[in-house]
Amino acid sequence: MTIKSDRWIRHMAQEHGMIEPFEPGQVRDTPEGQRVISYGTSSYGYDVRCGKDFKIFTDINSAVVDPKNFDAASFVDVHGDVCIIPPNSFALAYTLEYFRIPRNVLTICLGKSTYARCGIIVNVTPLEPEWEGRVTLEFSNTTPLPAKIHANEGVAQMLFFESDEPCEVSYADRGGKYMGQDGVTLPRS
């Protein structure tokens, strides 16, 4: 497997709709000149943005977190330009970008250093071959302080690895349960 470059990412996004909406370069400022946490195409990856809808874990309903029987009451919904994650807590968001992963590509997501240096960890499972949708992002605030996530700004980087041969069975072939997700998607059993 080889990591794919900015040229490949641009080609796949512009010619095959792999990423929509798509920024062909790095965006660091708004049109008004305000600094943002960068997003868009980088040398060997694509920095994604998160949307304005967040789900923050809460214990006000005394729910137990069970991935096989998930209770939506475990979350408080927040909509806005920022999300404040309580100390040592967790939130979900989604990418503004919609992805269509090619059959011979596996995509890995890593957090951006700007957030990592603040104790905010981004976790995303791999985007498997032929998966498509908006990515659900998992943010962990590992600090004893509240942490701020900025919507419409860079939060994580996607790395694309192309195999020398296509897989026998893709995510689409097996009817993966998160295919086509749009917005924050909770665990499905």
Curated annotation (Swiss-Prot):
Entry's Gene Ontology BP terms: dUMP biosynthetic process; dUTP biosynthetic process; nucleobase-containing small molecule interconversion
Record carries keyword Nucleotide-binding: yes
SUPFAM superfamilies named in the record: dUTPase-like
Highest taxon of source: Bacteria
Binding residue positions for dCTP: 112-117, 136-138, 157, 171, 181
Keyword Signal found: no
Xref: Gene3D superfamilies: 2.70.40.10
Gene Ontology MF, one: dCTP deaminase activity
The EC number(s) this enzyme carries: 3.5.4.13
Transmembrane segment boundaries: none
Family that this chain belongs to: Belongs to the dCTP deaminase family.
NCBIfam families registered for this protein in UniProt: dCTP_deam
Protein name, per record: dCTP deaminase
Biological source species: Halorhodospira halophila (strain DSM 244 / SL1)
